[in-house]
Structure formats: structure tokens, C-alpha cells
Amino acid sequence: EEVRPIIEKLMNRDIYVSANLDKVKSALEDMIPICVFGNYSAGKSTFINALIGCEILPSGGDPVTAKVYQIANADQPDQAVITFEYLNKCIKLYFESDVYRVEAEDSSSDLIQEINEKVSECDKNDMYGKINVALELINNYERKDKDVIVISDVINIKVPFSKNGILGQSRNNFVIFDTPGSNSASNLNHTKVLENALASFSNGIPVWVSQYESIDSQDNAALCDKILQIQALDERFTMIIMNKADCSNLPKNGFDDSKVKEIKEYVAVEKMYSSGIYFVSSIMGLGAKNDGCFQDEFYEDTFSTNKAKYDNPENKFYKTLYKYNIMPDSVRNRIFEMSEECPNKIFANSGLYGVETAMETFASKYAAYNKCQMVYLFLNSVIGDTSKRIDEKTKFLEENKKKRMSELEAAKKDLLDMLVRESQFTVNNLVDNTKTSINEFVNNTLHYDYSLETMETLTSEYRAENASQNNLDIHEHNFEE
């Protein structure tokens, strides 16, 4: 903070340098971002709802996410707040159990009136249901006129995470980012919003959500290329989530080595594979946290229909999705052991338990190191840019100095030449003026009244006197005497 003003002044408020300084500050904070990416229809919103343990984000088959959601765990178990900007003015929506209130400069705006109406009409009495209704309206508000952006791209949400999950019990400060699907043809702002949001990410866990059947698609490969271009988002910690795995035709006894090799060689997977591939059923994982109490009837029906398959080992179609995970053997074996010991069988068998365990491990063991690496990377970038600017300014000053010295030497020569000319002119002028002055003095000031005859007489007297003084004979005689 002390050095920043100096650097910014030196760099003339360079946007790129300021952004990297922001990233340094962000990386030094204790926040652990979980950056969730994926093309629409992959079930990103449902997956994030499962991580949180409640249905707050709108979800469905259509591209529903048009904004970037930044979701943090609330300090109180019965309080939540949504913060965003509308027409560049901050709005906060507070939810406290069954109480809802708004904090805004203009509480009479059309948007707030619509939100108030929707929340009051909400037949879901719980806090999460009202949040879901409010977010759905905010998310869809600009679709009325896609050329007008009146709501900020980032929506900040603080909501209590379920204590039935690892993230909700963790002391680590996890913050989840939900980004728009990048392949939505119905919303032209998706790619732009995604790129703008990713530009500010740092020190996070990249989580790529896809489906087993579409993982080798061109859309996924294109999305991976975008992720790999994000500066300082370390792909070494990327988690690949095969969502809706319970709907996929997976081999009963797991993948053999040849199939694992084939999956790893898919273009998108080959680009992104690092910490592992996780097979997950977000609906079942969410149901394991909320005891099967869903707002969405389809989710409730799905969970109710499949519950026995995840809870009863004697069931003919008993599912353990974590056994399909593809990752280093040491990590895989550890997740196996922990999942088998987990008392919540549905949570473990849905694969979500293994995902959250890996996130907690990253935050507890590797985040501090990663923060140092990120700070080092960003500071190196700032130092490099600053050094480059210093070198440029030094070179400019040196060149300017040489130029000024050359100009001064030329000016000095011109000045000396001018002084010589001026001096000579002054001397000549003085000589001419002196002659003129003497002549004028002699002619006008000195007056001799002797006539010619008088002058001749004086001359004769002078010569006579001079002759007597110069007569050697007289002087010799006087000497002898």
C-alpha cells in the first residue's frame, strides 16, 4: 500500500500495472476463489448450488447465467445479502430468515419494484427461495433490451453455506465464482462478460464443469483455450468435473487403462488435465445436504427416484461415482478411503464429497504456496513493466540531455559570435565617435587668436633661443672655465 502510489505515479496510472497491483492485493488476502467455468447446459449452476448446499442460483436447460456471481459464505447462519449496481448506483438486498429489506439510493426504481413484487409473491417461505427469485429476476432483467446494460456484470452474494458439506464447515475463506456459459447463442454478452471476469481472477482453483458425453466437443476445446490464456490462473490445479454422471452410460466396473488413456487424450482434457477428473451428480450431492428438500420439483423427483441407488449398497444399481475418478493413484486411493468412511453415503457416492475434499486440501496445503507464487508472478510483471518504463525514461532523458547539450553548444557559439560582432561594432563605433568628438572639440572648443605674423615672430624667437642653447662652442668655453 505504501509503494503502490509511487509505482502508479511513475507509471502514469498505467491500467495494466494497476490491474496487476490489484491482483497482488487480492492474492495477499485469505480468499480462496473457486472459479467455475463451463459451457451452458453443463449444469454449472446446479453444481455450484450443490457446493453451497442450497438452490440460490437459477438453473435449467437454457443458458441461464448472464452475469458473474461472486458467492461467499455469510457470517451468520440466517442472514444473506445480494449486492450489485443498477445504473451505476449500489443496491443491497438483505434477507434475514423470513425478513426482506432493500438498501438503495432510489428505492422507487422499476427494478427494485419488480424485485419487491416477486419476493412478496414468492410461495417459498424460506430465505433461499426468496434469494433464488430475486437472482432470477436480476439475471433476466436486461434480456428485455440486450443493447442496454444497466446492471453490473458482477453480482456479489453472501449466503450461509450448508454445514452438511465440507465447504460450509471449513475455516478457509472460499469464494465461488459462477461465470456465464461461453457458447450461448442466445446471449451475445456471454463471452464478453466471461473474458472481463476472468481478467481479474488470481490465486484460485479453476473448476471446469462438463459432461462425459460432450467433453471432446469443439466448444469445450475452445473454452479450454480461453482458460489457458488467463494470466496467473494456474492450470496445474484445474479440476475437471464430469457433471450429471449418473445420466451417463458408464461401465459398471469402471474404466480400463485403455479407456483412461483415451479420455486423457481428448483435446480439451489433454489441455486441462492436472489434479484430476471427478465424476459427480450435483442433484444427488445437493440432496445429500438438504435432506431431499428441493425447491425444484424435477430435482426432488430425481433425488427421490435415485436415492436408494446411492444409499443402499445392496441395491442392484448401487452407484459410487467417485470410483470413476481419473487422477494420480495416490490421490485417487485417498479419496476412495475417505469416501468409504464418510457417514453420509449419498454425499460420498454422488462424487461431491471427493470434490470438496480436494478443494479443502488445496486450500489447507497448497494455497499459501500458490499465493506466494501468484504474488511473485504479479510483482515480477509490475517490476518488469516499471523497470522497462524507467529504462525508457532514462533513455529519453539521456537523448534529451544530448539534444539539449547540442542545442546549448550551438547557442553558445551563436552567442560568442554575436559578442565578437557586437564588440567590433562597438569599437569601430567608438573610434568613429571619438574622431568626430575630437574634431568637434578642437573646432568648437579650442580657440587660437595668434596671427600669422605673430606666429612667425614667435617661431624666430624660439629658434634663436634654441640655437644658443645648442651652441657647442659656448658650452665648451663655459666648461673649461
Q: What are the roles of these predicted feature ranges?
A:
Residues 244, 378, 461:
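Short acidic/histidine-centered micro-motifs embedded in hydrophobic/aromatic stretches
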Residues 43-44, 66-71, 189, 195, ...:
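A sequence-level detector of short, solvent-exposed, charge-rich linear segments
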Residues 8, 14-15, 20-334, 342-366:
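Globular "head" domains of long coiled-coil molecular machines
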Residues 330-350, 361-400:
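C-terminal helical "lid" subdomain and adjoining coupling/linker elements of P-loop NTPases
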Residues 12-15, 120, 126, 325, ...:
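Short, flexible coil/linker elements and helix-boundary hinge sites characteristic
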Residues 384-481:
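A non-catalytic, extended alpha-helical scaffold characteristic of dynamin-superfamily P-loop GTPases
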